[in-house]
Amino acid sequence: MSAQVIAIDAMGGDFGPRSIVQASLACLSATPSLHLTLVGQPSLLEELITGQSAADRARLTIVPASEVITMDEKPAQALRGKPDSSMRVALELLRDGKVQACVSAGNTGALMALSRFVLKTLPGIDRPAMVAAIPTQKGYCQLLDLGANVDCSAEHLLQFAVMGSVAAQTLGIARPRVALLNIGTEDIKGNQQVKLAATLLQAARGINYIGFIEGDGLYRGEADVVVCDGFVGNILLKSSEGLATMIAARIEALFKKNLASRAVGALALPLMRRLQADLAPARHNGASFLGLQGIVVKSHGSAGVQGFQSAIQRALIEIQENLPERLHGRLEDLLS
């Protein structure tokens, strides 16, 4: 198998480089074809990678970057004021062909602004979109946009649908069912842009558009790709994660309530742990920036080791599936 080379913004995120480096080293050990480039402060990173085997160390490179973009920094400031940030250097490595993907847990707005500036968008795409996998009763669905674009035109939603459909195909779904998230399934429901997007999708070649979908339909697994603007998508994503955490906590508290419930809980514990692991936000961490001339995956800023590993794994899949090239080909056909 040919090598996959990924740049890691090692300084991004809420907690600094420790968990990012730990996740990177775990992925390196588990994937013999993987090569990682850690971007950040060399002295700090060298301390965190001690103890690696010679074979793993040979597939690990450190590239220096003297600046760090904070989580509360404005995108314009990050774009103009920090030319040697770890985030920007990682993206420039991708632009220059030295790596095949970039993964960052840093400031979302800054990452989007820098990605658009450094990498540019694919022809036919006005705005990149963030997409992630959401667990459903039947598996997973790809939800986009997740916050990159708060206000979207019908044409933007069409572009998101095309990109989401191709992303789902890379995950093994031959003919993804594409739906628009709406407040009802009837044709008269929704705002003007959503209604216009429905008309565009009905006429689009090669898109398996199935109509409007409500939030409960998403979780029942009625679609493989669900499209919405970033305002709605971000709220849905964060609500889903919060709900999963709350349900797990409530069930755990219920089983600890008294002696009888503890006995029942002991019997149900293996099943509950499996369910918790399946729904845990960390397992689904990693939102792809679709529509760029390169692979960029955004991890939650608060992600731990397991969560950041999931983001790296998503980047690996997109490298193996040549996602930007496939997107480019489909966009030429569908948006021409």
From Swiss-Prot:
One of its GO terms (biological process) is phospholipid biosynthetic process. Its EC number is 2.3.1.274. InterPro entries: FA_synthesis (IPR003664), Phospholipid_synth_PlsX-like (IPR012281). Pathway: Lipid metabolism; phospholipid metabolism. It comes from the Bacteria. Transmembrane segments: none annotated. Gene3D superfamilies: Isopropylmalate Dehydrogenase. Keywords: Cytoplasm, Lipid biosynthesis, Lipid metabolism, Phospholipid biosynthesis, Phospholipid metabolism, Transferase. It is found in: Cytoplasm. One of its GO terms (molecular function) is phosphate:acyl-[acyl carrier protein] acyltransferase activity. HAMAP family: PlsX (MF_00019). NCBIfam families: plsX. Catalyzes the reversible formation of acyl-phosphate (acyl-PO(4)) from acyl-[acyl-carrier-protein] (acyl-ACP). This enzyme utilizes acyl-ACP as fatty acyl donor, but not acyl-CoA. This is Phosphate acyltransferase. It comes from Pseudomonas fluorescens (strain Pf0-1). The gene is plsX.
